[in-house]
Amino acid sequence: MKLSKLLFILVLVLSLTGCKEYGEKRIVKLLTVSDDKISIYYYDYSADKPSYSVAEKENTGIENTLVQLLSDHEYDLKLCRYVVCDSNIIENNIEELFNGLVNSKFSMDTVIIQGDTDAEPEKYTELKKYSYPIYSYYVENGKINGIVENVADNTKNVISDSKLHTILTQQQSFAFDIIKNNIDKGTYVFEHNGVQLSANLENITVFCTVKNDTAQIKVNAMLKNFKGMPSNKTSKQQFMEIAQNSIENNIISLLDDRYMTEKLKLNWFDNLCSCNAVDIEVNLK
């Protein structure tokens, strides 16, 4: 086979598949979720002429369907600002939806919206043109407790950066509540000089503050009902250190590879939101 023919075939293959160096460049702008289907709207830059396209699958479970949908091609999720859901998804499946977004590594800039999933996608591409209600939920004692922000009315809304920032901050608290609710609140047992000691871990609170796109996490925990607590001051201090290390290790184990780059460093959503070190405070009383 002649060299010129080989070069022609190589160029043809690259033009059909997209050069590996640049990737496929499918930029997702919108995700819609209904009972029937999940759709992603994206700009396809892999072709010679960029085009607005849609990919969708039957909704057989939000988390699994999202994984299947996003595995068909290489998508860039950094600019996906909106997730539009039917009202019953918001009411009945909000936690499953949020878990799906976390597992699929959607941007922290993504705002969950109750709206019309059959509306024209152009309605969602520019914030100033958007007129559907935007909801932000907060979690208390492991339960979704209500609507924090509802900017819906019958006119078009221009949402200020500060208001949007408030919504994003409360969306982030969702993720940290997931961490909090998975921390084992059972009895911790320690060995100290051959003596078995124990205490109950209670009153865990996870705080998150966001400033200039940087998140600071603080975890407060409390140990109570000590059994076998040494009376010696030095031994008591050693016990406290052992207890604190045990709690910290328990919390760290929850921050798996999706969130961690190194010990106590978080890497939320591929550096889209840079985070400081986790600040773990343990109150031992």
What role is predicted for each listed range?
Residues K2-F8, L16-K285:
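Membrane-proximal alpha-helical signals and transmembrane carboxylates
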